C-alpha cells in the first residue's frame, strides 16, 4: 500500500513537471507572435520585418512601397502555386488576401511547398490562414471554402471580387492559381463581366513548363479569346508516358511560377518595371518566351466584346501620346539644321507581326479551332434530330421520360 | 483520336443548338430540353444496340446530375454511382463527370472522383460548343474511361464484383 502511494506521488510529480515544461514551451511560442505594426518603418533594425522591403524605396526601385497595405488581392486556388503566392504576398505585407479553394490538404501535396504534414485533412484555406496569420499578423484574411464553378457559389464569388477589398472596395487584382480549365473559364467569365484585371498562372501536367498571363478585359486577350497557350516543352507526346497518372508536379516549377506571378503583381500594384502580358517558362531548356496578346474581336464571351468596345472608345478619346512604353526619355534635338529624319527600314513582312502578332518562338496553342467543314465531317448534322427538338414538350415531361427509361 | 465506333455513336446523338448555361434563366430551360431530348435518344440507341450502360437524372433546375453507370467485364457487371454539376461556364466547358466511390482507387482521377479525360476530349468539346451536350460527354468521356479503367482495376483486384449489383 505504502509502495503504491509512493509511486503515485512520484508519478504526480513527474506529470506536474511535464505540464510545466509544456506550458513554458507554449508561452515561449506565443511570445514569438509579433504584435501588429501600424505603419511600415524603413528603420534598419533586426526587429523590423519590413526593413528590407522598405529598402526598395531607398534604392529607388519602388517609390511608394508602403502603399502595398492599401491593396487587396484575391487568390483563387491555394495549391502548389496559390499557397506560395499567398505566402509571398503575406511576407510582402499586402493589405488583404481573399483565398478561395474547396480542397483539403493531403500527404500527396507534400512534394510541393508551404503545407505541412500535420495539416493533412484541414481545408487548404483554413490551413493557409493559420500559417499566414502567424507569419504576418498585419495582413487581413478572408477565406472561402467552396468551388467557384458551382452555380450556387459563383454569384457569391463575383460579389467578393466586387466588394471584398479593403473598405468594401473591389479587389485590386485577382490571381488565378487553379489547376483546371473550368475554373479558369469561370474566373475569366466573372472578370470580363465586372471588368476586373486578373493574372492567370499555370504549370503543365508534366511539371516541366509553366506560364503567367495578364488579362485586362478589353485590352489584352481574355482566356476565352483563343485556345490556351502552351509552352512547347520539346517533349514528344508519343514518348510521354501517361499510363497510370493524371498529373505530375515539382516544387521547383511551381515555386518559379508563383515567383513570376507575385513579381508581376508587385510591379503592377506598386508601379515599377513593366508587366508583360505573357511570360512562359520551359524548364527543359531554361527558355522564357514573352509576348503581348491582343483580344479576339470574335471572342465567344459577350462581355469580352463589350470591354473591347469600351477600350477602343477610350483609346479614341484618349489617344496614346507616345507609342513607346519604355519610360526612358527620348532625346529631343531642339534644332535639326541638316533635316535628318529616321527612316523605318523594317521589312514589310516583319511589320505585319506587330499588327497581328504571331506566337513567340516556343509557344503554341493547346489545340486549333478547325473550320466549320472539319467539324461537320466529325459529327454529321442529323436533320431528323433537330426536328425532334421542335416538338412542344414540357421540361417536366422530358425529365420524367428520361427517368422512366 | 476518336475510333470509328465512337464516331458512329456520336453521329447518332442529336446535336444541341442553344448556347446557354445555368445562369441564362429562360434560355437555359431551352438548352435543358435539348439536353434531355439528346440524352433520351442516346439511351434509346444504346438499348437498341444492346449496349445500355448508364442512367441519369437531374434536379429540377438541371444543374446537378446523378445516376448509375455500369460496365460488363468477363460477363460480370460492375455498377457505379455517377454524378456531376453543370458548371457556370457550361456549355463552354464540359461537365466534370465523377464516380465518387472510385476516388483514391485509381490515379486516373482528380479529387472527388472526377475522371481524368484524354488530351483529345477538351479540344473536341471546345470545337463543338454549343453542339455537344451531356450525352456527348458521356459517350466521349465516361464511356471510353470505363472501357480502359474498369478491366484494369478488376485485374489488379482493386474493385471486386458485387453479387447484388449483377441483377438488372
Swiss-Prot record, chain B:
Gene Ontology MF terms: UFM1 conjugating enzyme activity; UFM1 transferase activity
GO biological process: one example: protein ufmylation
TM ranges: none
Residues of the active site: 116
Keywords, comma-separated and alphabetical: Ubl conjugation pathway
InterPro entries named among the record's database cross-references: UBQ-conjugating_enzyme/RWD, Ufc1
Record carries keyword Iron: no
Pfam families: UFC1
SUPFAM superfamilies per UniProt: UBC-like
Family: Belongs to the ubiquitin-conjugating enzyme family. UFC1 subfamily.
Function: E2-like enzyme which forms an intermediate with UFM1 via a thioester linkage.
Protein name: Ubiquitin-fold modifier-conjugating enzyme 1
Amino acid at each position: 500500500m505504502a509502495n503504491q502511494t509512493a509511486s503515485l506521488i512520484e508519478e504526480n510529480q513527474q506529470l506536474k513537471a511535464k505540464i510545466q515544461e509544456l506550458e513554458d514551451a507554449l508561452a515561449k511560442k506565443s511570445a514569438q507572435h509579433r504584435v501588429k505594426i501600424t505603419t511600415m518603418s524603413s528603420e534598419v533594425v533586426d526587429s523590423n520585418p519590413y526593413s528590407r522591403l522598405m529598402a526598395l524605396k531607398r534604392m529607388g526601385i519602388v517609390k511608394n512601397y508602403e502603399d502595398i497595405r492599401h491593396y487587396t488581392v484575391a487568390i483563387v486556388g491555394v495549391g502548389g502555386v496559390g499557397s506560395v503566392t499567398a505566402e509571398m504576398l503575406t511576407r510582402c505585407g499586402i493589405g488583404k488576401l481573399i483565398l478561395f479553394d474547396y480542397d483539403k490538404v493531403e500527404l500527396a501535396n507534400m512534394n510541393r511547398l508551404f503545407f505541412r504534414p500535420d495539416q493533412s485533412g484541414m481545408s487548404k484555406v483554413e490551413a493557409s490562414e493559420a500559417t499566414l496569420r502567424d507569419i504576418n499578423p498585419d495582413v487581413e484574411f478572408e477565406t472561402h471554402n467552396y468551388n467557384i464553378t458551382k452555380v450556387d457559389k459563383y454569384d457569391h464569388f463575383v460579389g467578393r471580387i466586387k466588394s471584398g477589398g479593403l473598405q468594401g472596395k473591389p479587389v485590386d487584382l485577382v490571381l488565378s492559381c487553379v489547376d483546371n480549365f473550368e475554373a479558369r473559364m469561370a474566373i475569366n467569365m466573372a472578370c470580363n463581366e465586372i471588368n476586373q484585371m486578373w493574372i492567370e498562372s499555370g504549370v503543365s501536367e508534366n511539371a516541366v513548363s509553366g506560364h503567367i498571363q495578364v488579362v485586362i478585359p478589353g485590352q489584352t486577350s481574355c482566356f476565352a479569346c483563343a485556345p490556351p497557350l502552351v509552352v512547347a516543352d520539346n517533349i514528344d507526346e508519343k514518348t510521354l508516358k501517361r499510363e497510370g497518372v493524371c498529373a505530375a508536379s515539382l516544387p521547383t516549377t511551381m515555386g518559379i511560377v508563383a515567383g513570376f506571378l507575385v513579381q508581376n503583381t508587385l510591379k503592377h500594384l506598386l508601379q515599377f518595371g513593366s508587366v508583360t502580358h505573357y511570360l512562359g517558362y520551359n524548364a527543359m531548356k531554361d527558355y522564357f518566351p514573352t509576348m503581348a496578346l491582343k483580344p479576339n474581336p470574335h471572342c465567344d464571351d459577350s462581355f469580352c466584346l463589350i470591354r473591347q468596345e469600351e477600350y477602343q472608345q477610350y483609346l479614341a478619346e484618349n489617344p496614346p501620346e507616345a507609342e513607346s512604353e519604355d519610360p526612358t526619355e527620348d532625346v529631343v534635338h531642339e534644332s535639326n539644321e541638316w533635316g535628318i529624319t529616321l527612316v523605318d527600314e523594317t521589312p514589310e513582312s516583319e511589320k505585319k507581326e506587330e499588327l497581328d502578332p504571331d506566337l513567340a518562338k516556343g509557344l503554341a496553342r493547346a489545340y486549333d479551332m478547325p473550320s466549320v467543314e472539319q467539324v461537320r465531317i466529325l459529327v454529321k448534322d442529323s436533320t431528323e434530330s433537330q426536328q425532334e427538338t421542335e416538338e412542344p414538350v414540357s421540361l417536366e415531361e422530358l425529365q420524367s421520360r428520361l427517368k422512366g427509361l | 483520336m476518336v475510333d470509328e465506333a465512337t464516331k458512329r455513336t456520336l453521329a447518332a446523338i442529336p446535336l444541341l443548338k442553344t448556347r446557354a448555361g445555368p445562369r441564362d434563366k429562360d434560355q437555359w430551360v431551352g438548352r435543358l430540353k435539348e439536353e434531355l431530348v439528346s440524352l433520351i435518344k442516346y439511351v434509346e440507341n444504346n438499348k437498341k444496340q444492346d449496349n445500355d450502360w448508364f442512367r441519369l437524372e437531374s434536379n429540377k433546375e438541371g444543374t446537378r446530375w446523378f445516376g448509375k453507370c455500369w460496365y460488363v467485364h468477363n460477363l460480370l457487371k460492375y455498377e457505379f454511382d455517377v454524378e456531376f454539376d453543370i458548371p457556370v461556364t457550361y456549355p463552354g466547358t464540359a461537365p466534370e463527370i465523377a464516380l465518387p466511390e472510385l476516388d483514391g482507387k485509381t490515379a486516373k482521377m482528380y479529387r472527388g472522383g472526377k475522371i481524368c479525360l484524354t488530351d483529345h476530349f477538351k479540344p473536341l468539346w471546345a470545337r463543338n460548343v454549343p453542339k455537344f451536350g451531356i450525352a456527348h460527354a458521356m459517350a466521349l468521356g465516361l464511356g471510353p474511361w470505363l472501357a480502359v479503367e474498369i478491366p484494369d482495376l478488376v485485374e489488379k483486384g482493386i474493385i471486386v464484383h458485387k453479387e447484388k449489383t449483377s441483377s438488372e
